[in-house]
A protein has these predicted regions:
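Conserved active-site "lid/cap" helical segment
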Residues: 1-79
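Short, well-ordered turn and helix-capping elements at secondary-structure junctions
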Residues: 13, 85-86
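Conserved catalytic cysteine-centered active-site region
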Residues: 38-57, 86-112
């Protein structure tokens, strides 16, 4: 007997911190300039999380709460949380587990 598994991404959320760090801000901190950075990376500004005590899982939580509000979901309906980050809150547990706990998605699986 063959079982066919079917999966679909039904929602995607995002969160961008309010604080901007521009290349001009970086010029004041290190020996660089806007032109040098833009010519090598194409980046002119980046967003940074400055609130004390906040971390990657808090940004992920905001993204999922956006989905929950828009789609009128119960957090228990969330089957899987995928989180990719180079700045985890801590090495273990995974950031996706922390996000799931914060939003009340108690039955989710995690992809990291």
């Amino acid at each position: 007997m063959t079982t066919t598994l079917r999966a679909a991404i039904t929602a995607v959320g995002g969160y961008v911190p309010e604080t901007k760090l521009t290349n001009f801000d970086l010029e004041k901190m290190v020996d660089t300039n806007d032109e040098w950075i833009k010519s090598r990376t194409g980046i002119s500004e980046r967003r940074i999380l400055r609130e004390p005590g906040k971390a990657s899982s808090d940004m992920g939580t905001e993204a999922i709460l956006e989905i929950i509000r828009k789609k009128k979901l119960d957090p228990l309906e969330i089957d899987c949380i995928i989180c990719a980050t180079v700045t985890p809150d801590m090495p273990f547990p995974s950031t996706a587990n922390l996000i799931g706990d914060k939003v009340g998605a108690k039955t989710h699986s995690v992809l990291i």
